[in-house]
A protein has these predicted regions:
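Glycine- and aromatic-enriched mobile tails/lids
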Residues: 1-130
Length: 130
């Protein structure tokens, strides 16, 4: 006989609507505050808005759409925190309060939720002259 297994996640279809609503709110925050042109004030406001959403949403433990919603908020927060950390403009990251590149930020930014941001140097390979 095949043993019965307990599913890892429940699936509450009523949570789908809540997830889609949250997804739109997060998209609006990221577009307005962490879009193409960024400022420290806007990024801080975006972070506060994300925290407000996280505090007001009701998440069910081990429920699929609740997990996806939490992950969405976590990724958005990590994006904003790394943008706040980089006090420069480079490539697709433009801060109007720091409009020029700064070589201090030629690095890999490493972060985890709830931990300090740290960096590691970028190792550039020398081109072969042959």
């Amino acid at each position: 006989a095949i043993p019965e297994t307990t599913p890892l996640f429940s699936l509450n279809h009523q949570k789908l609507e809540a997830y889609l609503c949250l997804k739109n709110k997060v998209a609006d925050i990221m577009t307005q505050e962490a879009g193409i042109i960024r400022t420290e004030n806007g990024l801080q406001e975006g972070l506060e808005n994300l925290h407000h959403l996280e505090e007001t949403e009701i998440f069910e433990e081990n429920e699929y759409y609740s997990l996806v919603s939490k992950n969405l908020l976590t990724v958005a927060e990590l994006i904003i925190r790394s943008a706040l950390f980089r006090k420069e403009s480079r490539g697709g990251h433009f801060r109007s309060d720091y409009p020029t590149p700064n070589d201090k930020y030629v690095c890999h930014i490493i972060q985890q939720k709830g931990k300090e941001i740290r960096t590691t140097p970028v190792i550039r390979k020398l081109k072969d002259k042959n």
